[in-house]
Amino acid sequence: MLEPGGLTGGTSGGSTHDISVLNSLIETTIDSVDGYRRSAQEATNSRFSQEFLARASEREQVVSALRDRVRSLGGNPEDDGSVLAAAHRAFLTLRDKVTGSDDAAVIAEVDHGESYLNGKWETALGDGGLSSETRSLIQQQYDSVREGRDTWRRVHQNMSSAG
């Protein structure tokens, strides 16, 4: 029985590497989807909530494209986020119960998460062992990831300088 993220018998060495990198991006991007959904629930400004939900939807499309590529390579795509991210969300929930949460704190956490995600994608793009097809897909999807990071970084900087 194959586990999510596992390989089928017909993968080559290059495909195995591509699948591994793609599954790592899938896992981290699922974390991003979960983070955006949590942020939408916590935001007090409805404009932020709507934008968080829109970003979650965009990230789901990214995950879908990456999963399709893993399947085309003969692998089984990841279907869960990381254990570390789940633990981090639990910590944030506890922290928020103790200290409270406001939109500035939510935006700061989104900015932090986006920076982490962006780094994972840049590392993948710098991986010389990827096939050109996989690298091309990662580059296409990275454009959406980078745009999200840039947007929230600007919002966070504006909120920080305003108060």
Which residue ranges define each predicted feature?
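Long, non-catalytic architectural segments outside compact domain cores
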Residues: 2-14, 18, 24, 31, ...
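Alpha-helical bundle segments that constitute or directly flank the non-heme di-iron/ferroxidase center
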Residues: 10-44, 104-129
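Preference for long, well-ordered alpha-helical segments
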Residues: 113-163
